[in-house]
Amino acid sequence: MNCAPPRQLFTFGTYVAVEAVEADLPAIAAFYAESPEYLRMVEAREPAPQDALEFLSAVPPPELSYRDHYALLLRDACSRIDGLMMVATDLPATGVWHLSLMMVATRLHGRGLAQAAYGAYEAWARASGACWLRLGVVEQNVRARRFWQRQGYVEIRRREGVAMGDCLSTVLVMWKPAANASLGEYLAAAPR
């Protein structure tokens, strides 16, 4: 678990994206409690105290290679957590940046924070050498699917029967180029 001081990775407007550290656990738990809709929709459950620790300690599955993994907090000018992101680089292949979670505080839905945060994330990924961007969106999360389509992502695969809490879901794997790299090149590099 990361106990070092938080490291700033990118900024946007009055926000900063920092790596989560152990001292952030109570604030992360409060964020989940104040914004339960995602867990209700995707896992059919209420937030629980262990969600904060799971966010902080989560890593990609052992069968997938990756270079770096970040549990990011989107903090406002007063250091309040208004969003969470999980990012893995070079997953499942060199040049692929995988965004496994992006969650914005419910009270800020519809106010442009997700758009601004995503734009800053994409700029950071591109500046850091990403060739392709990918993510998975749970099929029943229609609002998220539409958001990602507006960001230029296209569905390239469906993974059925993915365990999300106690639920089995269909996950839409979505992709977009971050550099002059084609879908064919991506599929050759990352066949999963």
Q: Where are the predicted features?
A:
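Short coil/turn segments at alpha/beta junctions that flank glycine-rich nucleotide-binding fingerprints
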Residues: 111, 127-131
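Acetyl-CoA-dependent GNAT
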Residues: 2-15, 19-25, 30-109, 115-120, ...
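C-terminal "cap" of GNAT-fold acetyltransferases
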Residues: 12, 97, 131, 138-145, ...
